[in-house]
């Protein structure tokens, strides 16, 4: 199919779907109010005047925003006068991004990928360069940015074999979008090769920004202090996805007492209440992190399961846990970021599905920072053994921190490449 026809059909479909997207956001805003904030921005509608020439970074959700924080720090270190525009697509991303703003910076929703919305967005902000985090490539945005003379960079770029196949299925849309990318800064050589196959001409291997994310030592220390108060080991399911919590609870109920404390930290905040009901329905005494502000109360210290229903406290949870089971890896979802756990010195047990972080998982296992398990049953068994074996657990913790430290430097490399275009 010719590119022009493919783009026209794509834009027409998005225009038809836009009212339904907006209605969905409004309904979602009943639980997460931020989704109802500034809905006009989704259509590229902005009030007032914006100072042109900002460095624009788009981070779709929480994980991408945290990776962007390392890049922003590196860019500011090289040019303190830079002013940023941060855009997001999810409430968790926007909430996390707000903490990265300084005087003169701005924040907005990324507009829907229709020609009118994207043109209005680019006319209003007039960025000097656009940086898209990880996998965000939008056909209309790429075309309109090229027309407006805005160089576009795909930073911390990754592309799995599955995503490559999907992209090639829609080659008339995605190949031109990839060709219009000024520069892609890939996490690995394998990612770089797949991105070149999509059509991007200039691709550099820069490493993974997630090794450079600063972890708050005060939060780690707080988690460690809580662990000392508990007086028993802690096994955690970290950044869990749908289906994993129920499967873990089914395994956990089989384990003989006395058991370690089980902590569950879900990936999506809208599922907190659902997971709480699952835990109580399985017959366990539950303590919710959101129920106390200071030190954990006595009833929490005696609970069977802690639910990590708070935001931006993962270093605290990794400081609390003796061993972390990697969420998203026990269902075919690609896994979650294990680098943060390693940086906090928390040993990781991963399931079979880590294709979204394939190289990081392989390197962590090779370094002794993580172990691979066939399924949750094996992970629980190994986790209990590690909880009981202080020497092996401490050795994995040391290896984890060394692994994380050895792979830093991507933020500096990416900042230098981006500033060459700005």
Please state what every model-predicted region is.
Residues 1-422:
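Nucleotide-activated sugar donor-binding and catalytic core shared by glycosyltransferases
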